């Protein structure tokens, strides 16, 4: 039995889980998320305030799907109830970011500013040199944060660029010069 897959997913108050036609849908105060699944691999049983994910056989691929769909369901329930947040830190002279409507506009030391379209379901706030990305979908929040970070990743000598708040950049020593 999968260690991840056998654990039940708790459903908090105000969250509804629906499973029908190969799609499981989770609806809550922060939004509505849905995900299709392999009906030949797993079943979902809604029992009161929790959901159990069971697999139909013991094949290798089915066991992989078992843990995967349980994790996806758990992340969706967490997302629609509390949401997910990623914080990016901008470090560099003249580097700045601002939200203009549905665009995140950033000056990152190049001749032109970067304009990134904020996807549907994602909320972006800029607090001085921090960009706070939040939303119900863990995948969408992480994907957008990665896309923004990729514009100017942190460099190891001075630490300039965009990094995650909890990311530790391994610093390097510059050239020492011959005397």
UniProtKB/Swiss-Prot annotation:
GO terms for biological process: cytoplasmic translation. The keyword Metal-binding does not apply. InterPro entries: Ribosomal_uL6-like (IPR000702), Ribosomal_uL6-like_a/b-dom_sf (IPR036789), Ribosomal_uL6_a/b-dom (IPR020040), Ribosomal_uL6_bac-type (IPR019906), Ribosomal_uL6_CS (IPR002358). One of its GO terms (cellular component) is ribosome. Pfam families: Ribosomal_L6. Keywords: Ribonucleoprotein, Ribosomal protein, RNA-binding, rRNA-binding. GO terms for molecular function: rRNA binding; structural constituent of ribosome. PANTHER family: 60S/50S RIBOSOMAL PROTEIN L6/L9 (PTHR11655), LARGE RIBOSOMAL SUBUNIT PROTEIN UL6M (PTHR11655:SF14). Part of the 50S ribosomal subunit. HAMAP family: Ribosomal_uL6_B. This protein binds to the 23S rRNA, and is important in its secondary structure. It is located near the subunit interface in the base of the L7/L12 stalk, and near the tRNA binding site of the peptidyltransferase center. Belongs to the universal ribosomal protein uL6 family. This is Large ribosomal subunit protein uL6. It comes from Treponema denticola (strain ATCC 35405 / DSM 14222 / CIP 103919 / JCM 8153 / KCTC 15104).
